């Protein structure tokens, strides 16, 4: 009995150093008392159906990919947060969730936003992070369309997904939101890459940026297009997809004599796009925190 008890105590002593330094999939060894979390940041949506297929889906993929991290979410749109609050649904902002994580004792945080561009929203998120105190390390992942490699991967995924809609006079148009920052040039880059990489019947246009609906109509006319499929170039196929793309844009192109169908699928619904966000989490870089 004494021998068995001695063996048990000996084994426990051997295990103690391992408890002091637990290996984490992103941060490496974590010391006793250190805890790691992943914060997924979304613009948000008031539509339950598309939320389940996009935001909830990518959150689930993150939990599956990083089982040793506590996964939380935050939303950035004040308007959507207010709408949901009236329904009795509470969504917190990045600042609120980060403060809560700090109170709960989390020391290492990685943040991944489901944004497309390196623009105003990413800059706003960095300002929120810069105000945080008490964390030992914070990492921020890149948006979906950060590099040329990212853009090429996305165009290939989309072209493959909609190959059924492409033909000699059949075209696919991916409609993005657009931006008032220099990041809006990314849409023109995507448009160019479709053609450069062998998908000349795939195009990109934007609701509030460039290329515009007017430039799109001129291009389709010059190409003698007959049929067009409109697809949201948006993480969530919400109000813009339903009102602008399937409404105003569809009507405008039909007035040009085109046969138009809409595939209202958000980027967040596509497994390969979800995989790209997961890869950006893995490659997230440390963000300098001031004391």
Language model regions located:
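Bacterial N-terminal signal peptides
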Residues: 7-15
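Positively charged n-region of N-terminal signal peptides that target proteins for export
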Residues: 1-7
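Sec/Tat signal peptide C-region and signal peptidase I cleavage site
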Residues: 17-21
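Extended amphipathic ligand-handling, pore-lining, and cofactor/metal-binding catalytic surfaces
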Residues: 22-291
